[in-house]
């Protein structure tokens, strides 16, 4: 188990979560990605 990879994966998923929240607050983006915004 490589702790550095785990940390990198956590950072990547944090970035995705931030991007998803930003997308879902923009109607045009949330319409294009309904699977992200529910």
From Swiss-Prot:
Alpha-conotoxins act on postsynaptic membranes, they bind to the nicotinic acetylcholine receptors (nAChR) and thus inhibit them. This synthetic peptide potently and reversibly blocks alpha-9-alpha-10/CHRNA9-CHRNA10 nAChR (IC(50)=6.9-54.9 nM), alpha-3-beta-2/CHRNA3-CHRNB2 (IC(50)=9.7-97.5 nM) and alpha-6/alpha-3-beta-2-beta-3 (CHRNA6/CHRNA3-CHRNB2-CHRNB3) (IC(50)=11.1-17.2 nM). It also inhibits alpha-6/alpha-3-beta-4 (CHRNA6/CHRNA3-CHRNB4) nAChR with a higher potency on human (IC(50)=6.75 nM) than on rat receptors (IC(50)=130-147 nM). Keywords: Acetylcholine receptor inhibiting toxin, Amidation, Calcium channel impairing toxin, Disulfide bond, Ion channel impairing toxin, Neurotoxin, Postsynaptic neurotoxin, Secreted, Toxin. The cysteine framework is I (CC-C-C). Alpha4/7 pattern. Changing residue 32 to A: 2.4-fold and 1.7-fold decrease in ability to inhibit alpha-3-beta-2 and alpha-6/alpha-3-beta-2-beta-3 nAChR, respectively. This is Alpha-conotoxin PeIA. The record marks 30 as: Residue that is not optimum for the most potent inhibition of alpha-3-beta-2 and alpha-6/alpha-3-beta-2-beta-3 and alpha-6/alpha-3-beta-4. Residues 25-27 are annotated as: Ser-Xaa-Pro motif, crucial for potent interaction with nAChR. The record marks 33 as: Important residue for inhibiting alpha-3-beta-2 and alpha-6/alpha-3-beta-2-beta-3 nAChR. The modification Cysteine amide is found at residue 37. One of its GO terms (cellular component) is host cell postsynaptic membrane. It comes from Conus pergrandis (Grand cone). Its main location: secreted. It is found in: Secreted. Changing residue 34 to A: 3.3-fold decrease in ability to inhibit alpha-3-beta-2 nAChR and 1.3-fold increase in ability to inhibit alpha-6/alpha-3-beta-2-beta-3 nAChR. GO terms for molecular function: acetylcholine receptor inhibitor activity; calcium channel regulator activity; toxin activity. Changing residue 31 to A: 4.4-fold and 4.6-fold increase in ability to inhibit alpha-3-beta-2 and alpha-6/alpha-3-beta-2-beta-3 nAChR, respectively, and 2-fold decrease in ability to inhibit alpha-6/alpha-3-beta-4. It comes from the Eukaryota. Changing residue 35 to N: 15-fold, 2-fold and 3-fold decrease in ability to inhibit alpha-3-beta-2, alpha-6/alpha-3-beta-2-beta-3 and alpha-6/alpha-3-beta-4 nAChR, respectively.
């Amino acid at each position: 188990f490589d702790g550095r990879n785990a940390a990198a994966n956590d950072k990547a998923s944090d970035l995705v979560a931030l991007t998803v929240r930003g997308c879902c607050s923009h109607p045009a983006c949330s319409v294009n990605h309904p699977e992200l915004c529910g």
